[in-house]
């Protein structure tokens, strides 16, 4: 939550967007909104295939930070919280109801980004040059609740390569 991202302790399923010949935890995630990362996917109505994904949504973002949902399930999707009995998946009152967010982009402009305790504790490399007095650099972050979308087995499918390329382009812009 320090960066405005909330990752759920669940596995997302979506009976309304299953991938043929795959089990319930492999699904088509739809692009959400007009963010530059997903704009072309939304316009073309192309989904991204994810497998064993966790929910990833906007949490409490630090002041001056913007968080936008990139991918989500249909309204039929849910975040299954009973991870012990995944073979018998069924929606119950403990599950996160759909549409379930699956990816988020977070950014903060220069001078508004706030150093966090997490950032300060994880300085393993030599420190970067200090910004000018009172100035903080802009930063961007993309979090996807699934790493399989970018692996060899799924990367060539559907909108997966577009999502990956657009995310890198946005991060480097």
Task: Enumerate the language-model features and the residues they cover.
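Acidic, S/T/G-rich, low-cysteine, solvent-exposed domains in lumenal/extracellular/periplasmic regions
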Residues: 1-173
